Design a protein with these regions (language model features):
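Short beta-strand-to-coil "C-cap" segments at the C-terminal boundary of structured domains/repeats
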Residues: 194-200
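Extracellular carbohydrate recognition
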Residues: 182-192
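Extracellular distal adhesion/interaction modules in secreted or cell-surface proteins
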Residues: 4-170, 177-179, 189
C-alpha cells in the first residue's frame, strides 16, 4: 500500500507470504499457512467487443473460486465492467479459508449465447497468476503508460510495471480469451481480483 502526499511516498513491504504460499511459483493457486479471512474485490473485467462505429461493449464475465478442499467452484461475481460494484471496487465476497487447503481462481465470459471455455489456476498452460506487492506483472500485461493497459489497473502498478498493493493483499490476473501468447488479445487482464487476507 502506498501512502502519498505531494512530497513523499512510503511503500510498505509485502508480509502476506508469511501467511500464504503461491504454487507453483508464478502460478495462481494460493495456499494459506494458517486459517485466515479473505475479502475479495473485482478490480476490473476487461473482456470486450468493438462495434462497427468503434464503441466498446463490455462482456458478461464470471469469476469463480474453489477453496477449503471443495471439489466444486463457487461464483464470486457474475457481471460486467460497467456494474456499479465493479466500478467502486467494493468487496464482493468474504470467506474464511482453512490452513493448507488450496484456493484456486477461475473465470469465463458469455458471448454469442454461450459461455466460453472455463480457465482457471488449475489449467495448463497457466492462465491465472497470483502476485504480491513488489512482484513484476505477468509479461503480457501492457506497460504502465501503454494505451492498452486497462484503466482499472493504473492504481495497482508503478511505472516499472511492479505490483503496488497492500502488504496483506494478493492480486489475481486472468487471461480468459486467448491461449496463444502471441495473439494481440492475450493481455492477462480479462479479469483482475484483489484478495485481502486478515487473521480476524
Amino acid at each position: 500500500m502506498c501512502i502519498r502526499d505531494r512530497t513523499w511516498n512510503i511503500n510498505y513491504p509485502s508480509v502476506v507470504k508469511n501467511y500464504i504460499n503461491i504454487t507453483p511459483p508464478g502460478g495462481g493457486t494460493v495456499v494459506p499457512i494458517q486459517n485466515l479471512i479473505c475479502d475479495i474485490r473485482v478490480l476490473g473485467l476487461g473482456v470486450t467487443t468493438q462495434n462497427s462505429n468503434g464503441s466498446i461493449n463490455y462482456i458478461e464475465t464470471k469469476a469463480q473460486i474453489k477453496y477449503n478442499g471443495s471439489a466444486s467452484w463457487t461464483t464470486l461475481y457474475d457481471g460486467k465492467e460497467t456494474d456499479t460494484l465493479v466500478q467502486q471496487q467494493g468487496i464482493v465476497k468474504t470467506y474464511t479459508v482453512t490452513a493448507n487447503k488450496p484456493i484456486d481462481f477461475g473465470g469465463q465470459y458469455y458471448y454469442n449465447n454461450a459461455w466460453s471455455t472455463f480457465r482457471s489456476s488449475t489449467s495448463s498452460p497457466t492462465l491465472v497468476w497470483a502476485l504480491v506487492n513488489g512482484d513484476t506483472c505477468p509479461n503480457r500485461v501492457p506497460d504502465y503508460n501503454a494505451p492498452s493497459l486497462e484503466t482499472f489497473l493504473k492504481n495497482y502498478l508503478d511505472s516499472s510495471n511492479k505490483v503496488r498493493i497492500g502488504p496483506m493483499d494478493v492480486i489475481i490476473f486472468m487471461e480468459l480469451t486467448h491461449t496463444v501468447t502471441t495473439d494481440v488479445g492475450y493481455d492477462q487482464q480479462d479479469c483482475v481480483l484483489l484478495v485481502s487476507f486478515r487473521t480476524s
